[in-house]
Regions:
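Membrane-proximal envelope biogenesis segments
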Residues: 1-96
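Intrinsically disordered, low-complexity segments enriched in small/polar residues
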Residues: 15-17, 46, 65-71, 75, ...
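Short, surface-exposed loop and linker segments with low hydrophobicity and enrichment for Pro/Ser/Thr
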Residues: 25-26, 206-210, 248-249
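Short beta-strand element of the conserved SAM-dependent methyltransferase core
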Residues: 29-31, 216, 254
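Extended, compositionally biased low-complexity polar/Lys-Gly-rich tracts
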Residues: 33-44, 52, 160-166, 201, ...
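N-terminal capping segments
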Residues: 72-176, 219-221, 232-234
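...with weaker cross-activation on analogous glycine-rich loops/strands in unrelated enzymes
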Residues: 94-106, 115, 156-158, 168, ...
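Low-complexity, Gly/Ser/Thr/Pro-rich intrinsically disordered linker/tail segments
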Residues: 249-263
Length: 263
């Protein structure tokens, strides 16, 4: 009910026994969330009846677990917005632009915060153009459409992301072109919960080691721990990318993000 499958291609570098590297193009399949309205229609077709408001409530809950919470809810605790407005991507402080590592994930997240990135469900760091905004309105008529006026007034023309998109955007960033290329560099397109459940190293928040670049998670939401008891997170449509304190934010678990090097 919630996904459609798409076949895409990617370039993979393979190191041969003699140390030479060759590139090959391979096909891969990704699961892409359908729009919320399409999920309603799919369930009606599956059940053979008109769905009820209770059905829709259940779908909304499952959908947010898959794709992340759309508006981010309300938060009354302290948070700090970055004061920048740049759309430039800056990797000058990366330790190793050619690998996907925890230190550079932290640098990337801090850059997104300092640059004042906004929040739009289903985005991952690209500039929110009129055409991209129109596509997201069609794709997520509730999750994005409900905030259309706010997004247009506050985020249009700047870079935007959602919570897990902040991590995926780093994974998909190609340093040679300085573009965020969907589904590349071994980072799949997965939601916050899928990222948590696919981790091989994780634990409850009270067991969290002090390692910058870990992700912190609760059901439907994920952020990047940057050290010093602080987190960068794409909090929600009305907040954008913000800095918060780790303690008291409701995080339940930590994880080493799959596809990120922590050595």
């Amino acid at each position: 009910c919630f996904y459609t499958w798409e076949t895409r291609t990617r370039t993979v570098d393979i190191e041969n026994g003699d140390g030479a590297v060759t590139s090959t193009v391979e096909e891969y399949t990704v699961a892409v969330p359908v729009s919320l309205y399409q999920a309603y229609a799919n369930l009606e077709a599956e059940l053979g009846r008109t769905i009820t408001e209770d059905d829709k409530s259940n779908i909304n809950h499952i959908y947010s677990m898959i794709a992340g919470a759309a508006g981010g809810g309300n938060y009354n605790g302290e948070f700090l917005r970055g004061d920048g407005s740049s759309i430039d991507l800056d990797i000058s402080a990366f330790t190793d632009p050619n690998s996907k590592n925890a230190a550079d994930l932290v640098t990337y997240a801090i850059h997104a915060w300092e640059s004042g990135w906004g929040y739009v469900w289903g985005t991952y760091g690209d500039v929110l153009t009129e055409s991209l905004f129109a596509y997201k309105l069609e794709q997520y008529p509730d999750g994005v459409g409900s905030y259309e006026d706010f997004i247009r007034a506050n985020w249009l023309g700047g870079r935007t992301t959602d919570c897990v998109g902040l991590i995926k955007g780093y994974g998909w960033l190609s340093p040679e072109t300085m573009t965020i290329d969907y589904g590349t560099h071994g980072m799949p397109d997965i939601g916050a919960n899928q990222m948590y459940y696919s981790a091989t190293e994780s634990g409850t928040i009270d067991t969290m080691p002090d390692i910058p670049g870990l992700a912190v998670w609760h059901d439907g939401h994920i952020g990047v721990y940057i050290g010093g008891g602080q987190v960068i997170e794409a909090m929600g449509t009305k907040y954008g990318v913000v800095k918060t304190e780790l303690a008291g934010r409701g995080w339940t678990h930590w994880l080493k993000i799959p596809y990120i090097n922590y050595d």
